[in-house]
C-alpha cells in the first residue's frame, strides 16, 4: 500500500494524545521529537497507508535494516501499537506501547539489532512470534519439525511425517506442508528451491513422490510412508539432506535469513 500525503485533518486530537500536543497531533513529528529528546536516531519514517481524517488507525512506517516497523495510533482513543516485521515472516513481534517514550525505546532496540529474547525481557508486554525467535536463535530447523509433527491428522498424514523425521537426510531439511503434501527445503524462508522432492497424497493409493519442478506424470507412486520416504531420499539433490543440524538440538544454519 502506497502512502498518501497527509492533509490538514490527518492530525490526531491532542486531547486524546497529550504527548503529541507540542506537535499539533502529528505522529511523525512527535516520534521525531521524542527520539531526539532520547538521543535516538530513528531509521527513515514515512506515513503508512492513507493519511486523512477518516483513517483509523493512523500509521507510521519506520524502515530499519532489520525490517519495517509499523506504529499505529488509534484515532478515537489513546492506543499506540507497534508491529515489527521481517521479510517472509510478517510480524516478528508486536506491542501496545504505553507512551511515545516507550515506543521510541522499542524502535531503537529493534533497529540496533537487540535480540528478540532480550527485548522481551526488557518489555514484558512485547509479544514475540515463536518462529521469529527460533530463526534468530538458530533453532528454525527444530522448530519447524516440532511444528509439523504437531499438526492434526487432517492436515498432514502423521505416519508420513514421523517416517520422514526418522530419516536423517530428510530431518536435516526444513519440512513444508501444503494441501496435505509434504515437501522439503534447505532454507527456512522462501524462496524455496523446486529441486527438492515432495510427497503428494494419491487417495487410497498412498502418495506420489517427485521433484516440485516436475510434472505429476513423472512422479513415483508409493504405497506406504516408508516407501514414500525412501523415494524422497533418492530424489534429494546431491547437496541436499546434508547434516547441518539436528532437530534434536540447535543448528547455526540460517541461509537466506534476512
Regions inferred by a protein language model and the residue ranges of each:
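Ampiphathic alpha-helical segments that act as solvent-exposed interaction surfaces
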Residues: 91-122, 209-258
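Intrinsically disordered, low-complexity regulatory segments enriched in Ser/Thr/Pro
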Residues: 65-106, 186-222
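Low-complexity, compositionally biased segments
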Residues: 55, 59, 81, 189, ...
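Structural alpha-beta junctions
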Residues: 36-40, 66, 204, 238
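N-terminal amphipathic/basic-hydrophobic helices that include classical n-h-c signal peptides
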Residues: 1-2, 252
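C-terminal interaction module
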Residues: 155, 159-235
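Negatively charged, low-complexity tracts enriched in Asp/Glu with abundant Ser/Thr
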Residues: 2-61, 116-188
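A compositionally biased, intrinsically disordered/low-complexity signal enriched
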Residues: 31, 48, 56-60, 93-100, ...
Amino acid at each position: 500500500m502506497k502512502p498518501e500525503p497527509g492533509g490538514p485533518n490527518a492530525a490526531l486530537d491532542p486531547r486524546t494524545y497529550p504527548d503529541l500536543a507540542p506537535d499539533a497531533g502529528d505522529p511523525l513529528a512527535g516520534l521525531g521529537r521524542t527520539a531526539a529528546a532520547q538521543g535516538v536516531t530513528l531509521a527513515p519514517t514515512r506515513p503508512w497507508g492513507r493519511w486523512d481524517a477518516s483513517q483509523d488507525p493512523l500509521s507510521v512506517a519506520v524502515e530499519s535494516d532489520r525490517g519495517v516497523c509499523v506504529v499505529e495510533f488509534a484515532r478515537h482513543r489513546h492506543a499506540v501499537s507497534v508491529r515489527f516485521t521481517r521479510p517472509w515472516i510478517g510480524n516478528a513481534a508486536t506491542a501496545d506501547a504505553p507512551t511515545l517514550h516507550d515506543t521510541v525505546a522499542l524502535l531503537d532496540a529493534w533497529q540496533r539489532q537487540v535480540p528478540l529474547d532480550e527485548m522481551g525481557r526488557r518489555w514484558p508486554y512485547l509479544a514475540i512470534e515463536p518462529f521469529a525467535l527460533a530463526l534468530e536463535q538458530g533453532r528454525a530447523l527444530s522448530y519447524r519439525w516440532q511444528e509439523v509433527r504437531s499438526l492434526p491428522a487432517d492436515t498432514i498424514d502423521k505416519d508420513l511425517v514421523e517416517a520422514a523425521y526418522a530419516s536423517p537426510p530428510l530431518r536435516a531439511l526444513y519440512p513444508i506442508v501444503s494441501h496435505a503434501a509434504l515437501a522439503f527445503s534447505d532454507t527456512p524462508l522462501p524462496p524455496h528451491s523446486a529441486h527438492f522432492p515432495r510427497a503428494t497424497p494419491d487417495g487410497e493409493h498412498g502418495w506420489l513422490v517427485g521433484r516440485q519442478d516436475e510434472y505429476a506424470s513423472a512422479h513415483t507412486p508409493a504405497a506406504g510412508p516408508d516407501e514414500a520416504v525412501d523415494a524422497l531420499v533418492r530424489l534429494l539433490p546431491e547437496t541436499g539432506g546434508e547434516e547441518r543440524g539436528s532437530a534434536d538440538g540447535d543448528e547455526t544454519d540460517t541461509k537466506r535469513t534476512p
